[in-house]
Amino acid sequence: MTKTIYVLNGPNLNLLGTREPDIYGHHTLADVEALCRETAARFGLEAVCHQTNREGEIVDLIHEAAKKQAAGLIINGGGYSHTSVAIHDAIVGVQIPTVEVHVSNVYARERFRHQSFIAKAAFATLCGFGIEGYRLAILGLAARIGLAAKT
């Protein structure tokens, strides 16, 4: 049975490629999802990708990941990273190894973006690598759960 990881993208990430390309680049959400699926497959993992603009749906997807015994979670909470205690609590509650990802370097941006509730629940945070951060997150997650790349 193939292990799964959930890749969750929060509000406005459906606009990747068109929203503020000077900050977020020209890659689309479809590019992110393809990158995640390809990278996960190198480790014998299946990446289950979701994007939603609704906080409660993110919480529900985190619960679903636990119910389906996902091996890990990659999350870009978008703006909810800085505001959502509910998402933090969901991650803590399910105890799935989690990596937080941000396309931009949140620490080079507005001060309110320097605080992340998700980071406090994740074992790692990556920011500023563009969509490459998702690949790096999967590499780190695979190492954390003891998987090596398949040749």
From Swiss-Prot:
EC number in record: 4.2.1.10
Gene source species: Afipia carboxidovorans (strain ATCC 49405 / DSM 1227 / KCTC 32145 / OM5) (Oligotropha carboxidovorans)
Site (Transition state stabilizer) location in chain: R19
The name this protein goes by in its record: 3-dehydroquinate dehydratase
Function: Catalyzes a trans-dehydration via an enolate intermediate.
Organismal lineage: Bacteria, Pseudomonadati, Pseudomonadota, Alphaproteobacteria, Hyphomicrobiales
Enzyme class, UniProt record, top EC level: lyase
Catalytic residues (UniProt): Y24 (proton acceptor), H102 (proton donor)
Pathway assignment: Metabolic intermediate biosynthesis; chorismate biosynthesis; chorismate from D-erythrose 4-phosphate and phosphoenolpyruvate: step 3/7
Oligomer and partners: Homododecamer.
